[in-house]
């Protein structure tokens, strides 16, 4: 292709049915940045191993050598995966970036499986190899407390209860729901997950003390302010991404420095954009898929709190932050693969690799919680809360039966009855036409007979 010639992307050359995808124009530039560099990575890896083998003296510290050997094994696996793993649906800022997080997902799942197969004591004490400060019970903290918005008992600062809630978790909630909105790309699903999680906190506050919050902290601070504002900003960003022109040109083909800087900045934006149209009420398959997505989202959210509790990790520990960063990077790819698999199963015949491993991670985390502290999760839920959940599940089942079975059967019956009526009316019309002709012929014969 000639230099500077624009072409449409392959995704637009073969549009998938029912897809809402923006048009992409690319000049086809394939620079050193985009190549796989498999030989280069293999050469660097070999040089590092040769250096460790021949030039570096191995220390006589069993614990240190064990840790270093495990880290080296993980790094070799990451090098292999980054260069050889299959590409996912995302290509920006670079396909290798998303291959890296796919391999990190595999490593994390293997780590969870290892923890799952340990005893409760050994699993908690194993965390000391990662951080010597871990492996000790968490101190008890007080939650809930005074829930007055305006406290007349503190005349100097009557709104102290509100200011006490203004900590680092407020921007974390906002940023988290902003990113979740970019993953899900649907306002209704985001709001349902946000409200449902608050109901879960209400229902499980007898198991985890940090779920015990004031009513205004649940519904005003969380749902309306933090989550709601994050969802609103996320939807505005989605609107901009859906309207943004996707025209890509090689960096060295851009004449001005301003254009080059702008091109570098846009490297961290999507290559193309697909608007998610979940349409859960369109058929039973999509309805069950959306319910499954909401369930897995809520389970992953609960795992965040329960894992900290059963593994004795304080909320401010860096491993908790690393887990959140991990899900931020793998969640978007997993949601895109789930949507592709659900929206066009004929083209995407199997669930994507990132979605598969994320689902396995979520289930494994929950199994660790079940094994390490079954007494906590088996604490009986209050009866009135159980009644509310039974009522909600019953309403979902009734609506599902009505929408996808009773309603469809009724519509099919009405359509069949209408067609039968049309067929019978056509038959009556066709039978009445010959009888009319015979009467007319009979009257003409009688007239001729009289004339004769």
Swiss-Prot record:
Which source organism?
Danio rerio
Which family does the entry's similarity section mention? Belongs to the phosphatidyl serine synthase family.
**Residue ranges, compositional bias (Polar residues):** 430-444
Any GO molecular function: L-serine-phosphatidylethanolamine phosphatidyltransferase activity
Q: Which pathway does the UniProt entry assign to this protein? A: Phospholipid metabolism; phosphatidylserine biosynthesis
Keywords, sorted A to Z = Endoplasmic reticulum, Lipid biosynthesis, Lipid metabolism, Membrane, Phospholipid biosynthesis, Phospholipid metabolism, Transferase, Transmembrane, Transmembrane helix
TM ranges: 36-56, 70-90, 100-120, 287-307, 309-329, 350-370, 377-397
This chain's protein is named Phosphatidylserine synthase 2
């Amino acid at each position: 292709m000639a230099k500077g010639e624009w072409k449409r992307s392959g995704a637009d050359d073969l549009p998938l049915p029912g897809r809402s995808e923006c048009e992409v124009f690319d000049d086809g530039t394939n620079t050193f940045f985009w190549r796989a560099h498999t030989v280069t990575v293999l050469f660097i890896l070999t040089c590092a191993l040769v250096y460790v083998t021949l030039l570096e003296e191995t220390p006589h510290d069993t614990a240190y050598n064990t840790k270093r050997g495990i880290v080296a094994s993980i790094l070799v696996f990451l090098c292999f995966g980054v260069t050889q793993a299959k590409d996912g649906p995302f290509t920006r800022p670079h396909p290798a970036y998303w291959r890296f997080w796919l391999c990190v997902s595999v490593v994390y799942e293997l780590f969870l499986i290892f923890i799952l197969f340990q005893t409760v004591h050994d699993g908690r004490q194993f965390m000391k190899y990662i951080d010597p400060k871990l492996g000790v019970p968490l101190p008890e903290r007080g939650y809930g407390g005074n829930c007055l918005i305006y406290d007349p008992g503190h005349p100097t600062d009557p709104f102290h209860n509100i200011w006490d809630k203004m900590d680092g978790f407020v921007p974390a909630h906002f940023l988290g729901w902003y990113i979740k909105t970019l993953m899900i790309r649907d306002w209704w699903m985001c709001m349902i997950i946000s409200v449902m999680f608050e109901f879960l906190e209400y229902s499980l506050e007898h198991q985890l003390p940090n779920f015990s919050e004031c009513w205004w902290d649940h519904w005003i601070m969380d749902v309306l302010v933090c989550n709601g504002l994050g969802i609103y900003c996320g939807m505005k960003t989605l609107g901009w991404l859906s309207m943004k022109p996707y025209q890509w040109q090689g960096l060295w083909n851009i004449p001005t420095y301003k254009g080059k800087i702008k091109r570098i900045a846009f490297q961290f934006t999507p290559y193309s954009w697909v608007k998610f149209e979940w349409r859960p009420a369109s058929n039973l398959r999509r309805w069950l898929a959306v319910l499954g997505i909401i369930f897995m989202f809520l389970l992953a959210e609960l795992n965040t709190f329960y894992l900290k509790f059963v593994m004795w990790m304080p909320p401010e520990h860096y491993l908790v932050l690393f887990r959140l960063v991990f899900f931020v990077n793998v969640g978007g790819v997993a949601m895109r693969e789930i949507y592709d698999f659900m929206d066009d199963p004929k083209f995407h015949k199997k669930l994507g690799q990132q979605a598969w491993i994320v689902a396995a991670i979520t289930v494994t985390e929950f199994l660790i919680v079940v094994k390490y502290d079954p007494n906590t999760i088996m604490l009986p839920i209050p009866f009135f809360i159980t009644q509310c959940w039974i009522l909600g599940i019953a309403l979902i089942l009734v609506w599902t039966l009505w929408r996808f079975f009773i309603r469809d059967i009724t519509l099919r019956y009405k359509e069949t009855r209408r067609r039968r009526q049309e067929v019978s009316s056509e038959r009556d019309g066709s039978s009445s036409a010959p009888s009319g002709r015979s009467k007319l012929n009979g009257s003409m014969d009688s007239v001729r007979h009289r004339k004769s």
